Structure formats: structure tokens, C-alpha cells
From Swiss-Prot:
GO function terms (MF aspect): DNA binding; DNA-directed RNA polymerase activity; ribonucleoside binding
EC number(s) from the headed UniProt entry: 2.7.7.6
Similarity-based family: Belongs to the RNA polymerase beta chain family.
Name this polypeptide is given: DNA-directed RNA polymerase subunit beta
Provenance organism: Oltmannsiellopsis viridis
Subcellular location: Plastid, Chloroplast
GO BP, sorted A to Z: DNA-templated transcription
Gene Ontology CC, one term: chloroplast
Reaction catalyzed: RNA(n) + a ribonucleoside 5'-triphosphate = RNA(n+1) + diphosphate
PROSITE patterns from the UniProt entry: RNA_POL_BETA (PS01166)
Subunit note: In plastids the minimal PEP RNA polymerase catalytic core is composed of four subunits: alpha, beta, beta', and beta''. When a (nuclear-encoded) sigma factor is associated with the core the holoenzyme is formed, which can initiate transcription.
Record bears the keyword Coiled coil: no
Keywords assigned by UniProt, alphabetized: Chloroplast, DNA-directed RNA polymerase, Nucleotidyltransferase, Plastid, Transcription, Transferase
């Protein structure tokens, strides 16, 4: 049951849309843009020209589908074809040809890529938006200086800075700084124009120019104002160059010195240091260009510097659109920041840009204006997967262009397009990106939540981003603009904290890459939630007064009169409702998907909520999934959007259902094509087509299918708030009869789901009519009545003349809907769902529609006497129950898969009044408000053709993390399903609801120290009932290699091996075989050199009758501790073998083993509130504490884990879960429920516990003296514990940190070469290592001998290791040696030139130095 009704219903965007939309954008426009940038490619003489036509490109269908690509270790990709034209202007010839540019990896429907058989995700990168940013620097003397960074989308960065002396400079990478005036003049601005454009022209009051300046510059003189005799920014010179300061002894101390000329003794090199004043300027642009090049190239001979060199330098750096690109966004941001009106198509730097940046910097110096906050989201944008792939594709094209230009240089007489274009550059660039980029990550497939979170992740790391070592707290922190855009809770622990984030539920990324979040307009204190919400980026919301989403609005949608909390910019204040501009659409708006799955989130500390969010992603899918009793309502959306559950693409009749496939018979759609709509989830969408006319948004549309009732009885009398409606729903007879007798027929949650087999009849005189009109908001498909849809659909004729039942037709596409717990929720969900974006709340956007009776005399209604269930009815029962009824029947003709509809079968029935005669042909009339109408005839006597749609189910499929992915069918043969209905569950869903753990009965109490420090005590029931048993699928790979003596071979002929019955003729274990430790999985032999046997050995072989072995066994065997069943074998071709090798049998084999893992001591478990722990003991169920009704507990947790962690939400959850256990109810509790009043959570929990006490008669369930606590009994003694204990039912998860993968033992293994200590880690077969804290612990216990043993012979005492065994065997005392690490330490100190040695005292008392390497 849903506890709290949402006030505002708003569509939740598709969770994977950020990935799919970006790649779709790349295919539609990005790819064309990148190729157009390199178009055309010419040689130096412009005679040869290669031109692409990117708008006509084509993609070939992939050779393998996504599943086959994973099994065969291939990339899921397609070939990119493009027409290319080669023009030779000298010979006036032209060639046109389609060529392959390369293989383009494709994104799957679920939003990831498959590279070399591994699913990978391109995560979204958060970078600084192109534009200009003004910052300030505080110096030690409390003086502030300012600088501006001009960041381009692609190209060199430019910094313009003001120093302490109020000089203004321009800096570029790898070049000395230069005066800003020279740069502005080089761009074509003269001095009067510059000064007129400045708000404070007096900034350059000391501006001066004398005629000797250029002469001195050309002679190699520099100006310096430094009181020191050294030049600032001087360079090291070669020996044959010497510089001296003229008159330095006279002038260096003077303050008025502007220039000190330098004389050089040779002309071989020229040195320019920093100019002391940036106010140096030139008379002409030519001089400025000369000075610009001379200053940026200080080692260049002045005689070789020309103004053209300066011009080409400027063009190369900032004016060439192929090299420097601000992007349209960067131009837009520059125009906004500097109040410019430069055309958006100009994406290079203009003189106007730099002039106004200089003006802004000078204004800041005078205290006018403010600096930018780089952490504000208006200054940061998202580079989505499509954009990252587009950039990498552009790099590949750049490489291709270089190759083509090189080939065009070679004057070949016969140039062909095929010889010019090679697929390697683009393939290589894409392979680099997908294989090695930090933004291309191995997809986290532990469960659907982990997958969907991984695809919505935002990273500030990667190329063009920040470095985790140097990132400070400012960039990691939470900014006010993160509200509704970036989750403040979900982020990793450790060094990536704050650098890797998640998108919130409602956020979306706009075309520019900025994150937007929705708000409702507030007019005079009233929330306008019936209109479409408005999406704001951080820049757009700056001047708005925004209220949070957890403010309660009354039934008239008015906010409270008291002062309300609001946010404007970064300030949080309070104000009255009349001043509020906008309000958030939901309290959940500020958190991410994983965080929104935590019930009672508002009662948890943020640090623990972070852990809870992260640990849900680590939950292992269990063999028997169980939905949570206490959820938040978003579980279905996560399962649905992840793409793991199977949903019906079209409505139809289930003809076959098994664990392998489901077949649905659907009617062939003969309706007109759906009009193409404009893109964007919330952009205005209108009718582009309609039957017989068009309709604008402002017009009203009324549609009546006169004469027929098509099983439709609901529509909307208000505007659509987000999209069109879902599956057409019919009334069952009871609701209809009740509604008709009450003279008003309403929709909403009263309406039942569609029962295709129910028919009703009314008296001929009775006539229904409707006066409701439906204003069209945004409609996603053409208007059409649901005539003759599906196997069980049938249109009943009510009357012919005035006795017609007009019908308000519902229009729209059906939405994918995941699952339903009961008929009631299915009814509600069917009526309330919205296409693409199912409604989060329970308040449906469809309002009531009035159906009135013109003639209320209803004499008889036919009430069918058969039992029905929502939307499902087996065909057999349906036919049996129709016998004797005065209704139409129809039969199925299997040949051709057609359905025919014969005439009425009339049989006497006394309880039925007169019914209308049937009519074979009817008319469906569409009426528009503009009086345009069209009549469409439909002949219902024709046959409806049906088409089977087959859905393949995944069966024990391996994920990236070795967990199992499998489908379980939930529909049976004979059922009718509508589009979007659930067909098959995943291994982590129940009824389409995400189910990652189990509901366990637990208590918070200490138990014999077994739950000390977060340890967990569990019942043996969880092991015996396989409650936490999970399936894991391991992949084993074998590939034959070439050895020194020949080629290996996969075969069943294995020498000296008897147990081979489970192998096939190739020597590979058969699918379905149970294998255990040591069994052969794949038989493989390697050739061996021939042995030179003596005559006696040969005779022995002859006597025994055994052949001399020429091969040795190198078979793949089941590893230690593993046992399972072989579920799949994939035979592949080896890629690294030369083609000339000829061999028998397969060359490469992948074998999959499914293994069951029960829960063990050492496994990690966790709740949803960050309460985690390791299982310390498994008790027999009879020893576990038990409740007053005799029920033993499943788990015992430490009560001290709650107060200090401040995650009290787990207490609310377990108490409400206990109430749900005894009431048989499930709860969906939205976080932040204090909107309904103070202590709402506590009131809910107590009221439900009290209700459970009343219903069950169990008085211990709610004790007012100690609510939530009860008396427990010790299972060992039967005695009652002295104190009441908090008992409840919580949802606990088993995490992927399994002890089976971590437990490790070593007797003999590898040692480190330097320290001679055992290696670290299970993967390297490492051993025990003692660190500082371990040594302290042993010292604290006084275990001196144990400590010495661990630090010497068990660690790195080489000689001691060899002597221990001998000493034990001969009963000698064990000698004490020197650890190798001590010798390494001495040698390291000696290598640092420190005189460190080891000394010993001999018998005579003398001190002798001992050689370190000869220490015992």
C-alpha cells in the first residue's frame, strides 16, 4: 500500500535517456559535423580535391547481435559507409565512390557498448564550460590581483592577468608573457579605440611611446624597472654571448627608470626579458605584429622577424577554426558575460572579445563587478558519451586527413579513392578511446541498480578534467546549484569523494550540456502543478526565488501563509508565499536513484546514507528474490528502465510461454503511421496529422465513435501534463452497472482493468451521452478508436438510430509498465501510467470524466457469472463460460493465423431484456472543434491478421562481475497482455520490482559477544532454506599456443588420465556436467621432446604394452574450492595463430561454470541505511532468541551500531516491516514525509503496529510503555531476557564481498626479490605480512617469540627458512637470523652517503664492523 499520496504528479524522465539521447545525437548530427570540418581535403597546389558527402552516410547492420558479441568476444559495431568524390582539376576528371571509413561501435538499447566481448560504459564527464572566467588571487601582503582565463572548446588557452604593479599581461603556454596593448594592437585595434572602450581609461595614464623603442627592441635591448641589477625573467645564454646593463650604477636605484638598454658582444643570439610595464605600445599594427612575434619567440634573430610571421602566429593560435574553436556555446557564454553581440557562427577569438575582457579586468581592479565561482554549475557542463565518441572520431579523422594529404603530395598518375582512404586511423582512435580511456569503464553489472547508476555517473576526472591528487575541497564540496541536479549524498568514499557524482532523479542534460531540473510556477502563493513544469539550468535560476519541494500545499494548491524557506543564488532565507516564483516538483528532486530507494532517508545521517546508496549497488542477485515489505515506490522504475525485465512491445495473446521463449500473437497494425514528433521530453508536441484534419494546441478535441463501445470508458477533461495516456482500459460489469445506476460514470481508481471478454447490454430506449471535451496538450500519436484490437477484442453494436452510445476515445501510445502486486494496483497503474515516463505519484493526471444518462431507465444488466482476474483469462475457461450467453462468439482459424467473427448466436435467456441487432459495418466519426470532420468506415466482418512476436529469454547469462543474469516468465499461455505489461522477471526482480535482498526478522541486542563491532549473528535457517544462496558464473578460457616443440592441441586423448567420461570427442566438458575440484574441463596436450630411453626402459614399455608418450598433459582443470555445473561451451577461433598452421580440433574455447554459493561466516551483509557487518557465527535456529509467539529470529544486530552512526531510519524500517509482516501488507514510503506534519514517520509506524496488534490479537506487537520493543526469550534456556528488545523486520542485502573470493592459505609461494618477504594478495598467492599495528598488537600481548618468528623465519630470514626444518628434525635449537629487510634498510641508508654500519663486540671487548651481507 502507498502511505502518502503525492500532491503533484510529474513524469520521471527515462533513467537511461542521457546515454541514449547523446549517442543518437552523435549519429544524427555529430558525425556529420566532424566530417564536414575536414571537408574538402586538397593537396598543396589545390589540383587534387577529396570531398566527403557526410549527410548521405550509411551504417551496415551489425554482423552479430549484442548477446553473440559477448559470447564470441567481439565488438558490437557496424561499418560506416560514406560517398567520396575525388576531383583532379588538372586532368578535369572526377571519381565518385562509396568507401568504408571504419567500424563504429554501437550503443545497445540499454545504453552501453560491447567492446571485445565486455560491456563497457562511457561515463559523463563534467568539465569547465568554454568561455571566460575571472578570478582573484590573494597575496601575502593582503593585496588582491585579478586574472581572466579564456577557455576554448578546442585549442590553446589564454590568460590575461593584472599584476601587483597594475600592469596587464597576456600569457600563453610555452611562451613568455607579453603586454596586453601589443596583443590588442596586433589584432587591429588602434590606441584611441582601446582607450574609448574602457570604463577607466586613466588605468593607462602612464602610457608612453618614443621613437627609440622599436630601435632598441630590434637591437636586442629590453626595458626593466627592477631595482635589482638582475633581469626578471632572464635566460641562460651560451658562452659567447654576454650582456651588460648600461649606466646601471647610476640609474638602477632610481624609481623613474623606464628602460635600461643592454649591449651585447655578439649578434649570434638575442635576449628579451619581461617588459616592466605592460603599457608599452606600438604606433602601427605592423609594429605590433612584429613585436608580438619577437616577444613570443625570444631566441629568434630580430633580423628574421617580420610582421607576417606575427600575423601567421596569431592565425595559427587563435584565428584558425580548425585548430581553435570556442564552440557555439563558448561564443554564447562570451556574449552573455561581456554583453557582446558577436554572431554565434564566429567561434574564434575577436579583438572585441579581448578588449572587453581587458575592460572587465580593469573594472575589477577598481572594485566594480565580481569574480566567477568555478564550482557553480552554470560554469560547468557535461560531456556526454556521444560527445566524447564524437571528439575521438574527430581525432581519427584528423589522422586520416594527414595520411590523405601525404598521399596526395605524391604525384601519382593513377590515384584511386580506395588507395587514399584507410580504415586504420579511425578504427585505431576509437579502439584507443574505448579500450584505454579512463572515461570508458568496465560496466558494473552486479545488479540492475549498479548498472543504471553507472550510466548516470558524472566524473570530474579524465582528460580535460581535474587531477584527483591536486583537487581541493572546493571542487569536492556541495554547491547550492547542485540542488536538483547532482546528488549531494551518492559519491564514492576515498580519494574520489566529490569528484565522481550521480545525476538526480528528475535532472536532464540540455543540448548545451548543462544540467536542468524542473520547477512548478507559483502565482500569488498557488502552485500551478496542472501545467507543464519548467526546466531551469543553474544560470536560468539565478534571479528566481525557489522553494523546496517538501512544503505542503492544500487541496486548492495554496502554500501555507507562514514564512517559508527559499533559496536565491547561494543564500537560504525565508519569505512569504506571494514572493515565491517557483517550487520544486518533488521532495525527491535533490537525490539520486540509489539514494531514493532508501526508506525513511530523512532520519539517516548523510554519511551513512552515502554508504547505503553505494552498498545497494554491491548487492548480489539471489536465487530466490524477495521484494521489500517497506519500499519507496521507485523499485519498479529502476527495474523497468534498466532493461533487464522483459516487457511486451505490443498487445496480444500469449500462445507459448517457457523458460526459453515467450510467443505473443498480436494483430497487424493497419492504422496510419504515427506522425514524427519533435524531440525532447518536455518540448511542446502537437498533432502533426489526424484523421480528416489537424488540431492546434489551443483547440479542443472531441472524438466520438458513435454506435460502438470498444471497451473504452475513460479519458481526460484536463490538459495532459506530460504526455499522452497509457493502455486503453475497459470497465468491468460491476463498476459499469453501479456507475450507470448512479447516472454518472467516473474514471480514476474506480475503473477496473480491461477484460476483453465482458459484454453488457442496455435497453433500446436508453441513450448515453457525453458533453466532455478534451483540450489537447501534447499528443504522441494519431487519434484512433480501439476497434477490433487483438484476439479477444470485439466491437458490440448497441443501437442503430438515436439509441447510440457515444464514446470518449482515449488516445495515445501505451507505456511500458513493469509489474503489479495485486489486481487493485494493476487497475490503478493501468489507468495512471504515462508513456515513456510512468507517473511517480499516485495522483493520476487523468481527471474524472462525466458520463450522464439521457434516459436513466435501465431495466437489466447482464452480470457474467464466471470468475475473472485482472487482464488475464485462459481461452478454455472463456469458451466454457460463454455457453448459453446471448453474446457473440468467435473461433480461431489456425491456418494463416486469422480470426473470423461469425454472426450472433442467439439463445433464449429469460434474465435478459431485448438487445440490439448486430451490424457488420460501422462508422467511427472524429469531430474536431474547428468543425472539420472525417468519416472512416471500418468493416468488422473482415478477418484480422495476427502476427507472432517471439521474445527470447536469457538463461544463466554471465555478467561482468560473474553474477548470473536470467529471466523467469510470469505470463502463462492463454493470457492477454497489453503493451508494456511484464512478461518475464529478472534474477533481481519480483513482479517487476527491484528485489536485491530478503526481509529478515531481527533484533537489536548483544548476544555473547558475537555481534561485537558490527559483527552479525544469523540463523541456520538462512543457510538451509537457501535464503541467501547466489549463483555465480565463472568463465574459463583456453587457447592453443605454439611451443618450442610444436603446436598444442585440444583433445580427449590425454596421457595417464582415467576420468574422461564427461568430455566430448574434442576433449571439452559437456554442458550439464557436474564438475568438482581437479576435474578436467578442457583437455589439452603439448608436444614434448623425444626421450632417449635405454634398452631396459624400452623393454619395460614393450612388456607393459604402453606407448612411449610424446605429449604432456596441460589440461585446464577445475580450480581449488570450486564445484559446479558446466552450462555453456563456446568454441572460437584463435586470433594470434599464423594462417599457415594446420591443426585438428578447436583453437580457442570458452567454458562457463555455474556455482552455488551459500552464505558463510565471513560474508559481508548490509541494510539500506549504511548498517554493514561481517557474519561472525551461524546459530542453529533452536538456539536463536524467539518472539512471544514462538517465532525464532533470523538475525541479531548490535544496538550500539545505531546511536553513534545516527542512521535511525533502520529502526523505522524494521518496525514498519514488522507491522507489514503481521498485517500482510507492503508499504511504499516516500522519503521526506515531514511535509505532512511533524513526527509523521513515528505516527505511521506506531499506528500500523497498533493496527497489527488489534488484528492479530498479539498484544506484544505494540506496548505504549515501550513502543517498538518486546520481550524476547533465549532459545537455549527458554528464559526471558531481562530488558525489552527492539524487534523488527528489515531488508538485508548480501554484498559481493564474499569470503569465498577472499579466503586464502599459503604454505610455499613467491617472495619479493628485494625484501624477500612474501608477496601481497590472493591473486599473487601471497602470504602473511606484519605491519606496524600488527607488531604493536603482539608486543601488547607480550608474545615475543611469536613476534620474532613472524618477523624472521616466517618472513624474510633467508638462511633461517632453510635451517628451521633441519633444526626441528634434529631437535636443535632454532638459530636467530637477520631479516632481509634490515639489510635492505642499511644498504639504502649507505646509498644516501650516510655512514651507517653494523658493529659487533668481540671477546676482547673491541668493536668490529660487520659486513651487512654476511650477517647471520
Amino acid at each position: 500500500m502507498n502511505i502518502y499520496l503525492r500532491q503533484n504528479s510529474f513524469l520521471v524522465p527515462d533513467f537511461i535517456a542521457v546515454q541514449r539521447n547523446s549517442f543518437s545525437q552523435f549519429l544524427e548530427s555529430g558525425l556529420i559535423q566532424e566530417i564536414s570540418k575536414r571537408n574538402p581535403i586538397t593537396n598543396s597546389t589545390k589540383e587534387l580535391e577529396l570531398c566527403f558527402y557526410p549527410q548521405y552516410y550509411k551504417l551496415s547492420p551489425p554482423e552479430l547481435n549484442a548477446k553473440q558479441s559477448i559470447l564470441k568476444n567481439k565488438t558490437y559495431s557496424c561499418r560506416l559507409y560514406i560517398p567520396v568524390k575525388l576531383t583532379n582539376k588538372r586532368t578535369k576528371t572526377l571519381k565518385l565512390q562509396w568507401v568504408v571509413l571504419g567500424n563504429l561501435p554501437l550503443m545497445t538499447k540499454r545504453g552501453h557498448f560491447i567492446i571485445n566481448g565486455s560491456p563497457r560504459v562511457i561515463i559523463n564527464q563534467m568539465v569547465r564550460s568554454p568561455g571566460v572566467y575571472f578570478k582573484e588571487v590573494s597575496h601575502a601582503d593582503q593585496k588582491l590581483t585579478y586574472y581572466a582565463d579564456l577557455i576554448a572548446y578546442r585549442g590553446a588557452w589564454l590568460r590575461i592577468e593584472l599584476d601587483k604593479k597594475a600592469d596587464i599581461w597576456a600569457r600563453m603556454k610555452k611562451t613568455p608573457k607579453l603586454p596586453m596593448l601589443i596583443l590588442l594592437q596586433a589584432l587591429g585595434l588602434n590606441l584611441p579605440t582601446i582607450l574609448k572602450s574602457l570604463n577607466y581609461p586613466k588605468f593607462f595614464e602612464n602610457l608612453g611611446h618614443d621613437g627609440n623603442f622599436m630601435k632598441q627592441l630590434k637591437k636586442g635591448r629590453v626595458s626593466s624597472r627592477s631595482s635589482s641589477q638582475e633581469l626578471s625573467g632572464s635566460f641562460n645564454l651560451s658562452e659567447d654571448v654576454s650582456l651588460r646593463l648600461d649606466d646601471s650604477s647610476k640609474n638602477m636605484g632610481a624609481e623613474n627608470v623606464q628602460r635600461a638598454p643592454l649591449q651585447k658582444s655578439t649578434k649570434k643570439a638575442t635576449l628579451f626579458g619581461d617588459f616592466s610595464r605592460s603599457s608599452v605600445y606600438c604606433k602601427t599594427q605592423e609594429e605590433a605584429l612584429w613585436a608580438l612575434y619577437a616577444l613570443t619567440h625570444p631566441l629568434k634573430n630580430p633580423d628574421e622577424v617580420t610582421a607576417n610571421l606575427g600575423k601567421s602566429f596569431l592565425y595559427r593560435k587563435f584565428m584558425n577554426s580548425r585548430v581553435y574553436d570556442l564552440s557555439p556555446l563558448g561564443r554564447l557564454r562570451l556574449n552573455q558575460k561581456l554583453n557582446l553581440s558577436v554572431n554565434e557562427n564566429i567561434t574564434t577569438i575577436t579583438a572585441q572579445d579581448l578588449l572587453f575582457i581587458t575592460n572587465t579586468l580593469i573594472n575589477l581592479n577598481y572594485g566594480v563587478g565580481k569574480v566567477d565561482d568555478i564550482d557553480n554549475l552554470k560554469n560547468r557542463r557535461i560531456r556526454t558519451a556521444g560527445e566524447l565518441v564524437q571528439n575521438q572520431f574527430g581525432i581519427g579523422l584528423l589522422r586520416l586527413e594527414k595520411i590523405i594529404r601525404e598521399k596526395l603530395k605524391q604525384q601519382q598518375t593513377k590515384l584511386s579513392i580506395g588507395s587514399l582512404i584507410n580504415t586504420k586511423p579511425i578504427n585505431g582512435a576509437l579502439r584507443e578511446f574505448f579500450g584505454s580511456s579512463p572515461l570508458s569503464q568496465f560496466m558494473d553489472q552486479t545488479n540492475p541498480l549498479a548498472e543504471i547508476t553507472h550510466k548516470r555517473r558524472l566524473s570530474s576526472l579524465g582528460p580535460g578534467g581535474v587531477n584527483r591528487e591536486t583537487a581541493g575541497m572546493a571542487i569536492r564540496g556541495i554547491h547550492p546549484t547542485h540542488y536538483g541536479r547532482i546528488c549531494p549524498i551518492e559519491t564514492p568514499e576515498g580519494q574520489n569523494a566529490g569528484l565522481v557524482n550521480s545525476l538526480t532523479i528528475y535532472s536532464r542534460v540540455n543540448p548545451y550540456g548543462f544540467i536542468e531540473t524542473p520547477f512548478y510556477k507559483v502565482v500569488k502563493g498557488q502552485v500551478q502543478n496542472s501545467t507543464r513544469p519548467i526546466f531551469f539550468s543553474a544560470y536560468q535560476e539565478e534571479k528566481k526565488l525557489l522553494a523546496p519541494g517538501d512544503i505542503y500545499a492544500n487541496k486548492l494548491k495554496y502554500l501555507p501563509k507562514s514564512e517559508l524557506p527559499i533559496r536565491k543564488l547561494a543564500e537560504f532565507t525565508r519569505t512569504t508565499r506571494e514572493k515565491i516564483d517557483y517550487i520544486s516538483v518533488s521532495p525527491l528532486q535533490m537525490i539520486s536513484i540509489a539514494t531514493s530507494l532508501i526508506p525513511f532517508l530523512e532520519h539517516d545521517d548523510a554519511n551513512r546514507a552515502l554508504m547505503g546508496s553505494n552498498m545497494q549497488r554491491q548487492a548480489v542477485p539471489l536465487m530466490t528474490a524477495e521484494a521489500p515489505v517497506v519500499g519507496t515506490g521507485l523499485e519498479c522504475r529502476v527495474a523497468s528502465d534498466s532493461g533487464h525485465v522483459l516487457q511486451a512491445k505490443k498487445s496480444g495473446f500469449v500462445t507459448y510461454s517457457s523458460a526459453e521463449k515467450i510467443t505473443i500473437l498480436s494483430p497487424v497494425d493497419s492504422t496510419p503511421a504515427v506522425p514524427k514528433l519533435s524531440k525532447g521530453n518536455n518540448s511542446p508536441q502537437h498533432f502533426h496529422e489526424s484523421v480528416g484534419g489537424s488540431c492546434k494546441e489551443s483547440q479542443s478535441l472531441q472524438a466520438a465513435a458513435e454506435g460502438y463501445l470498444s471497451g473504452v470508458a475513460s479519458s481526460s477533461s484536463s490538459k495532459f501534463t506530460g504526455s499522452s495516456f497509457s493502455t486503453i482500459s475497459a470497465l468491468n460489469d460491476g463498476v459499469l452497472r453501479r456507475a450507470l445506476t448512479q447516472k454518472v460514470l467516473t474514471t480514476g481508481t474506480n475503473c477496473s482493468s480491461m477484460l476483453k471478454n465482458q459484454r453488457f447490454f442496455v435497453e433500446p430506449k436508453a441513450q448515453l451521452y457525453t458533453g466532455a471535451q478534451t483540450p489537447v496538450g501534447r499528443v504522441e500519436t494519431i487519434l484512433q478508436p480501439n476497434h477490433a484490437e487483438g484476439y479477444l477484442s470485439e466491437v458490440e453494436t448497441i443501437q442503430q438510430t438515436q439509441n447510440k452510445l457515444p464514446l470518449q476515445v482515449r488516445f495515445g501510445v501505451e507505456a511500458p509498465k513493469s509489474s503489479f502486486d495485486s489486481e487493485a494496483t494493476k487497475i490503478s497503474s493501468t489507468l495512471n501510467s504515462i508513456p515513456q515516463h510512468p507517473v511517480l505519484g499516485e495522483d493520476s493526471p487523468s481527471k474524472q470524466v462525466g458520463w450522464a444518462l439521457k434516459d436513466p431507465q435501465i431495466q437489466t444488466m447482464l452480470k457474467p457469472k464466471w470468475h475473472h482476474s485482472a487482464q488475464t483469462m485462459s481461452r478454455e475457461n472463456w469458451y466454457q463460460n460463454l455457453k448459453g450467453q446471448n453474446v457473440k462468439t468467435f473461433t480461431q482459424v489456425e491456418s494463416g493465423r486469422l480470426v473470423t467473427k461469425p454472426t450472433n448466436t442467439k439463445m433464449p435467456m429469460s434474465s435478459l431484456a431485448g438487445t440490439a441487432n448486430s451490424k457488420k459495418t460501422g462508422e467511427a466519426l472524429y469531430k474536431l472543434a474547428s468543425s472539420e470532420s472525417a468519416t472512416k468506415s471500418m468493416d468488422f466482418s473482415t478477418k484480422t491478421q495476427l502476427k507472432p512476436i517471439t521474445y527470447e529469454l536469457q538463461k544463466l547469462f554471465r555478467s561482468n562481475q560473474d553474477t548470473s543474469i536470467m529471466h523467469r516468465p510470469v505470463v502463462r499461455e492463454g493470457e492477454w497482455v497489453n503493451r508494456g505489461d511484464l512478461l518475464a522477471d529478472n534474477s533481481t526482480t519480483v513482479g517487476g520490482e527491484l528485489s536485491l535482498g530478503k526481509n529478515l526478522l531481527l533484533a537489536y541486542m548483544p548476544w555473547e559477544g558475537y555481534n561485537f563491532e558490527d559483527a552479525i549473528l544469523i540463523s541456520e535457517r538462512l543457510v538451509s532454506d537457501d535464503a541467501y544462496t547466489s549463483l555465480h558464473i565463472e568463465r574459463y578460457e583456453v587457447e592453443i599456443r605454439e611451443t618450442k616443440f610444436g603446436l598444442e592441441q585440444i583433445t580427449s586423448q590425454i596421457p595417464d588420465e582415467g576420468k574422461l567420461s564427461h568430455l566430448d570427442h574434442f576433449g571439452i566438458a559437456k554442458p550439464g556436467t557436474w564438475v568438482e575440484e581437479g576435474d578436467i574441463l578442457i583437455g589439452k596436450v603439448a608436444p614434448m621432446p623425444q626421450k632417449n630411453l635405454s634398452r631396459y626402459e624400452k623393454l619395460l614399455y614393450d612388456v607393459v604394452g604402453k606407448k612411449i608418450s610424446t605429449t604432456r598433459d596441460t589440461s585446464l582443470r577445475v580450480p581449488r574450492g570450486v564445484s559446479g555445473r558446466v552450462i555453456h561451451v563456446e568454441i572460437l577461433n584463435a586470433e594470434n595463430l599464423p594462417p599457415e598452421f594446420v591443426f585438428e580440433g578447436p583453437s580457442r574455447v570458452n567454458l562457463y561454470i555455474a556455482e552455488k554459493r551459500k552464505i558463510h561466516v565471513g560474508d559481508k551483509m548490509a541494510g539500506r541505511h549504511g548498517n554493514k557487518g561481517i557474519i561472525s557465527n551461524i546459530l542453529p535456529r533452536q538456539d536463536m532468541p524467539y518472539l512471544p509467539d514462538g517465532t525464532p529470529l533470523d538475525m541479531v544486530l548490535n544496538p550500539l551500531g545505531v546511536p553513534s552512526r545516527m542512521n535511525v531510519g533502520q529502526i523505522y524500517e524494521c518496525l514498519l516491516g514488522l507491522a507489514g509482516r503481521y498485517l500482510g501488507q507492503k508499504f511504499k514510503v516516500r522519503p521526506f514525509d515531514e511535509i505532512y506534519g511533524p513526527q509523521t514517520s513515528r505516527s505511521l509506524v506506531y499506528s500500523k503496529l497498533y493496527e497489527a496488534r488489534l488484528r492479530t490479537g498479539q498484544r506484544w506487537l505494540f506496548n505504549p510503555a515501550s513502543p517498538g520493543k518486546t520481550r524476547l526469550f533465549d532459545g537455549r534456556t527458554g528464559e526471558c531476557f531481562s530488558q525489552p528488545v527492539t524487534v523488527g523486520q528489515a531488508y538485508m542485502l548480501k554484498l559481493i564481498h564474499l569470503v569465498d573470493e577472499k579466503i586464502h592459505a599459503r604454505s610455499i609461494g613467491p617472495y619479493s626479490l628485494v625484501t624477500q618477504q612474501p608477496l601481497r594478495g590472493r591473486s599473487k598467492h601471497g602470504g602473511q605480512r606484519l605491519g606496524e599495528m600488527e607488531v604493536w598488537a603482539l608486543e601488547g600481548f607480550g608474545a615475543a617469540y611469536t613476534l620474532q618468528e613472524l618477523l624472521t623465519v616466517k618472513s624474510d630470514d633467508i638462511k633461517g627458512r632453510e635451517q628451521v626444518m633441519e633444526s626441528i628434525q634434529k631437535n636443535k635449537t632454532i638459530s636467530l637470523g637477520t631479516p632481509e629487510s634490515f639489510k635492505v634498510l642499511i644498504r639504502e641508508l649507505q646509498s644516501l652517503c650516510l655512514d651507517v654500519g653494523v658493529y659487533a663486540v668481540d671477546g676482547s671487548g673491541k668493536i668490529k664492523q660487520v659486513d651487512t651481507m654476511k650477517l647471520p
